[in-house]
Amino acid sequence: MDDDPAGQYHFDPETYLDLVTSEMPAYFALQEATAEATTGVDTARILELGVGTGETAERVLAVHAVARLTGIDESAEMLDRARKRLPQADLRVGRLEDALPEGTYDLVVSALAVHHLDGDGKAELFMRVAERLRPGGRFVLADLVIPDDASDTTTPIDDGAYDKPSRVEDQLRWLQAAGFLARVTWAHRDLAVIAGDRP
């Protein structure tokens, strides 16, 4: 992982999977749980926040084969790799702090990206996600969290300059404030998948 003059960090798409699986042994279980949490929603349009190399999108599209996916990531290099896996997807350079792509979506998904925002940033993002979801749509958030038991912290993180995980309870509260009916669908140590349905 390298930082650029703007203070952003970028992963090497060639080595990202090896890095994340070495630091996060439950990575593939998290990915499977993320895809599972998207089931049960009639889905034609998907928005992914933090596409990375396309690992999550590929799994979600396997569940929703006829859906169209729009995705953002701040790394053009990661998106180049993702486009090879997802040639039909509309992938764009963009940050979580920026305006989300226009339109109404049935499903919004984010895996291992939102923990880079602080608490206020997460709460504000959840409000903007709710605005993009149709009634009956779902937001699936899979991420690094602060566990109740500190001994469950297994994923290496920095001093808060880039990694800013939050407690599950706080994220459920922010999601509820944004209008979601939110619940935890999977959890393992310092990882969790949360599904929020928009009434």
What spans do the regions from the language model cover?
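Short catalytic micro-motifs in class I SAM-dependent methyltransferases
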Residues: 112-116
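Class I SAM-dependent methyltransferase SAM/SAH-binding core
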Residues: 47, 53-98
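C-terminal lobe and adjacent flexible extensions of AdoMet/dcAdoMet transferase-like proteins
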Residues: 194-199
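C-terminal alpha-helical "lid/dimerization" subdomain adjacent to the S-adenosyl-L-methionine
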Residues: 138-191
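Nucleotide donor/acceptor-binding cores
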Residues: 43-44
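A short glycine-rich, Lys/Arg-flanked "PGG" loop and its adjoining helix->strand segment in the class I
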Residues: 123-135
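Conserved class I S-adenosyl-L-methionine
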Residues: 1-40, 154
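A conserved beta-strand element that flanks and buttresses the S-adenosyl-L-methionine
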Residues: 109
